[in-house]
Amino acid sequence: MSRYQCPDCQYIYDENKGEPHEGFHPNTSWNDIPKDWACPDCAVRDKVDFIFLADSPSKETQLGVNSQLANSESGISDATPTGMAVLAAELVIPLNQENKNEGCAAKTEVLDQASTPQVVRKSSTRKKMRNK
């Protein structure tokens, strides 16, 4: 079954779901919808303006994804975008925390070393010039 999207409001007609409010039962083919049918959200009149998106996932595909999720330890398959994001976050967050702690200590030391001697040098230079 296929899906079609309205170009104005992005409403999606899914043949698997149909549009019960419009009188189209689930599994109503796009070809069975009258040509003068209007988008239920924004009333675009021309059915031909709708954009073909793709075939809807079949029940077999959905079952395959569900079993893949059930078999993974975390409940999120590593092959999905969400799974990849979770993996990346697990790797990056500890590194960032270590770098932040090291960076703060290093910056504090540099500031302490740079600011204190400069003040002393300027004041000692002024004192020497006054004494002459």
From Swiss-Prot:
InterPro entries, per database record: Rubredoxin-like_dom (IPR024934), Rubredoxin_dom (IPR024935), Rubredoxin_ET (IPR050526), Rubredoxin_Fe_BS (IPR018527)
Region: Disordered, residue numbers: 108-132
Example GO biological process: alkane catabolic process
Keyword annotations from UniProtKB, A to Z: Cytoplasm, Electron transport, Iron, Metal-binding, Plasmid, Transport
Textual note on the cofactor: Binds 1 Fe(3+) ion per subunit.
Inducing stimuli: Induced by AlkS.
Gene3D superfamilies in the cross-refs: 2.20.28.10
Residues reported in the UniProt entry to bind Fe cation: C6, C9, C39, C42
Major subcellular site: cytoplasm
Domain Rubredoxin-like: 1-53
Basic residues composition-biased segments: 123-132
Comp. bias regions, Polar residues: 113-122
GO cellular component: cytoplasm
UniProt pathway: Hydrocarbon metabolism; alkane degradation
PROSITE patterns tied to this protein: RUBREDOXIN (PS00202), RUBREDOXIN_LIKE (PS50903)
Swiss-Prot/TrEMBL cofactor(s): Fe(3+)
Keyword Lyase: no
Function (record text): Not known. Probably involved in an electron transport pathway, but not required for the hydrocarbon hydroxylating system. Seems to be non-functional.
The name this protein goes by in its record: Rubredoxin-1
Source organism: Ectopseudomonas oleovorans (Pseudomonas oleovorans)
